[in-house]
C-alpha cells in the first residue's frame, strides 16, 4: 500500500519539528513538493509540459537553508544531493564539470532504490544467510578430488560398497548435526560463536582515484570495463555469528536483486523526483563594480550550469538522464552580490525567490528547546551517560540566546551555528569533570552563564577568537 502524499500544511508541520521560523521558505518548498504529486496525476501530454519551479533562497549562513532542503528530501524519499557552486570550473579547466552533479544524483538514487529492494528481500536473504552460517559451523566432508588410479575408469574399478555406505552414514550425521545447529541458531544460542567468512576485499576504485579531477566519468567507464576481466579478491575474516549474519545477509540480498532493474528505476526516480541543492551560488555571481578575469570565470560556470537547470540529457553509467523535471534549489548569503548579478538566463530559471530572516533572540531560544533534535537535549543526553541529570533554567536559556545574538551582531553572523560554539564553551569544564562528579543533578543558572561567557561576550576582540 502506497503512503498517502503529504499536504503542504503537513509538510510545513513536519519541518517545524526540526527548523525554527522561516515560514516563507518552508511554504515554498512544500508547494514545490506537492506540485510534483499533482503533476504525476496529469495525462502524459500535459505532464511533459509542467516543469518544476526552481527556488532561490537568500539569507545569511546558519538560518536553515540547507536543512530545509535536506528535510524535504527525507520526507519525500527523493534522491537529494547538496553541491557547492564554487567546486565547479568551466569546461576546459581542471576541476569538476557541472554534469557530475547529475551523475552524483543518480548514484544517490541507486543507493536509495537498492536499499528499498534489499529491504523487500531481507527475510529471504536472512534465511539464506542462516543456512550458510550453519554450513560454516558444521562443515561438510571434503570431497576427494581426482581418481586415485587413472586406469580405474577403464577397467571398472570403483570404491567398495562398504566405503559408499560409510560415506552415506557420515553425510547423514552431518545433516543431523546441521539440523540441531539450525535449531540452536534460531533460538539465538550461538550469537557469540566465531566463524570464518570469506568476504570481498574492498579496494580503491579508479573512480575514487580520479575524484575531483574532472575525469570521474572516464574513471567509471574504465572501472566497468576492467571489473568484468579481473576477478574480485576475497579474504577470510573471523567474526561472531551476529556479525557474520549482517555480512552474509547483505551478500545474499545483493544476489536476489536485479541491478539492471535498480539502475533503470534509479534513473527514472532521479528524473522525476530528484532534488539538487546548489549552495554558495552567490559566490559565482559577478560582483558589482569593475569586472575582472575572476568574473569571466564565474560567468563561465554559470553558463555551464544553465543547460543543466534548463533541461538537458546527461550520460551516466546507468543510462541517459534528462534533467527537465529535476527540482533545483539554489541558496546563497548574497552579502557581496545580489541575485541580479547572476546572468539573466540563470535568474529566469529560478522564478521563486525566498528571503530567509536573520535569527532573533526569541528564535535562538526556540532553537535551543523546540526541535526534536534540539541542542540542549543533545547535551543532556550526553551527560546522562555519566549519570548526571543536566537542567537549564528558563532564564539561563534566555541568557545563552542573548549572548549568541549579540556575538553574531558584533562579529560575523553565522546564525544558529553560533550556539554550538557557545554551548561548548559554557559546558567545557562540566564535560571535563563529569566522570568524577558525584552530584546527580546540576542546574545551569543565568549566573553560571554570565560567569562563563559574560566577559568574553562583552569583549569584541575576545569574541572574535573564542566564540
Swiss-Prot record:
Regulation: ATPase activity is much induced upon complex formation with ClpQ.
Family annotation (PANTHER family): ATP-DEPENDENT CLP PROTEASE ATP-BINDING SUBUNIT CLPX-LIKE, MITOCHONDRIAL-RELATED, ATP-DEPENDENT PROTEASE ATPASE SUBUNIT HSLU
The protein's name: ATP-dependent protease ATPase subunit ClpY
Binding residue positions for ATP: 20, 62-67, 279, 345, 417
Family label: Belongs to the ClpX chaperone family. HslU subfamily.
Protein species of origin: Bacillus subtilis (strain 168)
Domain of life: Bacteria
Localization: Cytoplasm
CDD domains: RecA-like_HslU
Subunit structure: A double ring-shaped homohexamer of ClpQ is capped on each side by a ring-shaped ClpY homohexamer. The assembly of the ClpQ/ClpY complex is dependent on binding of ATP.
Pfam families xref list: AAA, AAA_2, ClpB_D2-small
Entry's Gene Ontology cellular component terms: HslUV protease complex
Gene3D superfamilies: 1.10.8.60, P-loop containing nucleotide triphosphate hydrolases
Assigned keywords, A-Z: ATP-binding, Chaperone, Cytoplasm, Nucleotide-binding
Function in brief: ATPase subunit of a proteasome-like degradation complex; this subunit has chaperone activity.
GO MF, any single term: peptidase activity
Gene Ontology BP annotations: protein unfolding; proteolysis involved in protein catabolic process
